[in-house]
Amino acid sequence: AVDGWAVQAADTFGAGERSPAVLGVADQRVSTGRAVRVHTGSELPDGADAVVMIEDTTTVGEEIEVFDAAAGGQHVAPAGEDVATGQALYERGHRIRPSDLGLLKSVGIRRPLVADRPTVGVIPTGEELVDQEPAPGEVIETNGLTVSRYVERWGGQSTYRDVVTDDSAALRAAIQRDLVRDVIVTTGGSSVGARDLIPDVVEELGELLVHGVALKPGHPCALGVVEETPVVILPGYPVACIINAVQFLRPLIYHLAGGAAPPHPAQQARLDRKVLSEPGVRTFARVRLASEEGELVATPTRASGSGVLSSVALADGWVAVPEPLEGYDTGETVSVQNWESHQ
């Protein structure tokens, strides 16, 4: 009930500003011609079938004047209207939001059973990487930082490690140190060059399941297992690193938390420049979005290299070209995915 008077609706029929219904006041039970004072959240008194809001009444001595007729059931919430007995509130794997906590508490669940956040060790690798002020031939480490923040956004708990040099013994020790985590992620050293040592190290310690995927950018990705701990080996080029993290690490984190990764938010847009792709490869194009005469238009970024990090940071979304296609033509309507949403 709301703050007001519980009544029998029939007693208020015809009530108005000039001819209010006059009712007596009772303490507990509503009967013909009598009303009981109620407050927000109160149980409806016996005998009542409606509530008149307090602002639609005036108290005159031991009586009230009602200036607005009530209909049966007015301002009354039936038991079970919010949550019914036996009703399932959430599916397994649902991520609890602030509003969920309020609902759970309202039905008496103060400590819901939840899955632990998956723990993820993020290990950036490469002897050329430094934290700041790079000398000629050196590069500031960004991949590990980026991936660790994505891990947190996707519901994991990341440990962002210091850079490990391109040395088999050092890489082996770094991976073994993080076997206490639910997932190990490395960045860099995933290809087949002289300094790309991580796939071999993982194969020595456990099993290398995949080395190379049909994605562009992002072909030199690898997946393995060491002592039942998944190892995701991401490329060193920043764009390729992000693409593979979204495609492989994101669903893994959601799976370990007991759920499935939700679809990325997406919107339809008209492509204003052709996007090319190689058949048999899934290509991801970065695009900027703009509204032109009420129509959403997607413009592929001109910087398409897998090492141009600004092309990701300044993009509004991604267009995925499926494996069977050779691309999209100018003017085609495409789905633009937002990978930066909080999911």
Predicted regions and their residues:
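Phosphate-interaction motifs
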Residues: 1-110
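Short beta-strand segments
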Residues: 8, 37-39, 67, 91, ...
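Phosphate-binding glycine-rich loops and their immediate beta-loop-alpha structural context
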Residues: 75-186
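Short Gly/Thr/Asp-enriched flexible loops that form oxyanion-binding sites at enzyme active sites
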Residues: 193-205
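Flexible glycine/proline-rich
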Residues: 64, 83, 203-343
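Short glycine-rich anion-binding loops that position phosphate/pyrophosphate groups of nucleotides
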Residues: 12, 41-42, 127-128, 189-192, ...
